Amino acid sequence: MRSEHFVNNRNCSLLTALSPNKKDMTKEELKKYLPHREPMLLVDEINIDENKVVHSKYHVTGEEFFLKGHFPGQPTVPGVILCEIMGQSCALLILDDLKDKITLYTGIDNVRFKQQVVPGDTIEVEATLSNQRANMYFCEAKATVNGKLCAKGSLSFALIEDQRNK
């Protein structure tokens, strides 16, 4: 890892794998970067803006496995799933570094859940990279539904070699 890969909110110097003309990705394109597959691929689409902020969406259909028993008669997306959605979005902040590597989460701090997420909702995540040291990355993420905050937190992850294809 090169030393110029240090980032903070004011000076994001990490590059992404996206060209200046390709900042939007579909779920199928995301599979090139994330190791997750259905039913655990929890990002439907993303956009990385000019400030290196990830904007992602996940559409809650009501058919998800995690809604089956949480809660009968009143299905609600579990908080841990909201964390996973934010986590997958954070990994997309470092697309350029994901080649032959995967992210393993090392911490989720200061997470707060503010409102329920139910079938029919579209979860929108905004994630930023706040710091990086060696192979460790630190992010801030918030999830909203219809502009209302439903979850927020600080996430950290390590970037490791992808052993699946070796």
Name each model feature, range by range:
Residues 51-55, 117-121, 128-166:
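HotDog/MaoC-like acyl-thioester-processing domains
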Residues 24-30, 121-125:
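Short Pro/Gly-enriched beta-strand edge/turn motifs at strand-loop
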Residues 89-124, 150-158:
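Hydrophobic beta-strand-centered segment that forms part of the acyl-chain substrate-binding groove
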Residues 46, 77-100:
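Active-site helix/loop of acyl-thioester processing domains in fatty-acid/polyketide metabolism
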